[in-house]
């Protein structure tokens, strides 16, 4: 592991003021030393429980906290020095300017621009408008079919209406004669068939 090698080399290179480093090397490198750990049981019948040393506390903390989850200040400093880029290294001259690419003209766009001049007057046909036109045509077609199917029945109903109008017209003429003092129509009088012309 690269981090372990760097740590071991750093520990060898740094001279210590005392005879021993402030923390055990085995704790930094992640190895365990088979030494006397913290124990609550007394060593002898007349002796009290021995207090744990500083190295034992570090080894106990090393066992309780996994190595992958804990990052020491030395490891964070080495990571910042070796792996992360420095802020003052990059200068304005080394940064390459972004390249600008000239896109070729689109043939579809040119054709659309030329065609827009002739199609500008034409209304835009949308899907909704197309559906409305188709529905209108279908309704007209169904209406024409219904008219053709019921043309004889409609003719019969129309003739009945005209006949009733003619009878009403003759009654109105008779009432006018009676108001004028005539008991009947004059000789040679024929009531016009204004509603039944072809009959």
Curated annotation (Swiss-Prot):
One of its GO terms (biological process) is positive regulation of proteolysis. Keywords: Mitochondrion, Nucleus, Ribonucleoprotein, Ribosomal protein. The gene is AURKAIP1. Belongs to the mitochondrion-specific ribosomal protein mS38 family. InterPro entries: Ribosomal_mS38_C. The keyword Nucleus applies. Component of the mitochondrial small ribosomal subunit (mt-SSU). Mature mammalian 55S mitochondrial ribosomes consist of a small (28S) and a large (39S) subunit. The 28S small subunit contains a 12S ribosomal RNA (12S mt-rRNA) and 30 different proteins. The 39S large subunit contains a 16S rRNA (16S mt-rRNA), a copy of mitochondrial valine transfer RNA (mt-tRNA(Val)), which plays an integral structural role, and 52 different proteins. Interacts with Aurora-A. The keyword Nucleus applies. May act as a negative regulator of Aurora-A kinase, by down-regulation through proteasome-dependent degradation. SMART domains: DUF1713. GO terms for cellular component: intracellular membrane-bounded organelle; mitochondrial inner membrane; mitochondrial matrix; mitochondrial small ribosomal subunit; mitochondrion; nucleoplasm; nucleus. Ubiquitously expressed and especially highly expressed in heart, skeletal muscle and testis. This is Small ribosomal subunit protein mS38. It is found in: Mitochondrion matrix; Nucleus.
